[in-house]
Design a protein with these regions (language model features):
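Membrane-interface helix-boundary motifs at transmembrane edges
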Residues: 68-71, 96-105, 133-137, 170-171
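Juxtamembrane helix-capping/reentrant segments at transmembrane boundaries
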Residues: 32-48, 102-112, 176-183
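Residue-level detector of conserved catalytic or cofactor/ligand-binding positions
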Residues: 186-195
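N-terminal signal-anchor/initial transmembrane insertion module
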Residues: 1-60
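Membrane-interfacial catalytic/cofactor-binding modules of polytopic membrane enzymes
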Residues: 133-147, 151-187
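Helix-coil boundary and interhelical linker segments in multi-pass alpha-helical membrane proteins
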Residues: 1-7, 58-79, 118-144
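Hydrophobic alpha-helical segments and helix pairs
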Residues: 72-127
Length: 195
């Protein structure tokens, strides 16, 4: 099983590279670049739930079927992972403003990726990792460093979502580039490095 899992990881990495390259040549058909050639329109709120909930559901199923259900370290990782996707799949869509739509094809690709992501993460955490992999995790600094990085990333993500949601005034439909928070850093140092 571990050999198949390694092949799966390699395929996922190659797909990530292929998508990265492809997006330099094709416009992603969502957001202000919305394009019906990627499928019929779905309201953003529904699209987000459909796109993000498979990872939450699949991870829950993998956890429930695992022999490691109540082991402390896998359970801690599950709580962090599910906390992120609870926010992404069910809370974030409720906060989306406006009446934008996304193409069904983009939603379908998101569902596929998120399902594979759950299989990749949950497969390792609950099934593939060696039996002694989690021994002493809570007595070693890397667990706490990783958890702190995760929480910092989550805070940045929530703040970035807040900035995006508040770019427009009610009724405004124009497109804006965010320039606050870490968006400011990316605009100044990444998008315009000579500035």
């Amino acid at each position: 099983m571990a050999a198949y899992f390694n092949i799966f990881l390699i395929v996922m990495a190659l797909l990530a590279l292929a998508v990265y390259i492809a997006l330099h040549y094709f416009e992603a058909g969502y957001g202000y670049l919305f394009n019906r050639k990627y499928g019929f329109p779905i309201p953003n709120r529904i699209g987000w739930v459909l796109m993000e909930c498979p990872v939450f559901i699949a991870m829950t199923v993998l956890w429930l079927l695992s022999d490691r259900t109540w082991e402390a370290a896998p359970l801690a990782l599950l709580i962090l992972f599910q906390g992120h996707y609870l926010q992404r799949a069910f809370i974030f869509p409720l906060l989306i403003r406006g009446n934008s739509k996304m193409p069904a094809g983009i939603v379908g690709m998101g569902m596929l990726f998120n399902t594979l992501n759950a299989l990749m993460q949950g497969g390792w955490i609950f099934y593939i990792s060696p039996a002694d992999y989690y021994d002493g995790w809570f007595s070693k600094p890397y667990f706490y460093i990783g958890a702190a990085l995760f929480v910092a990333g989550m805070v940045i993500n929530l703040h970035s979502d807040y900035i995006i949601r508040h770019l427009r005034k009610p009724g405004d439909t124009r497109h804006y580039l965010p320039a606050k928070g870490l968006y400011r850093l990316s605009l100044i140092h990444i998008s315009e490095p000579t500035r």
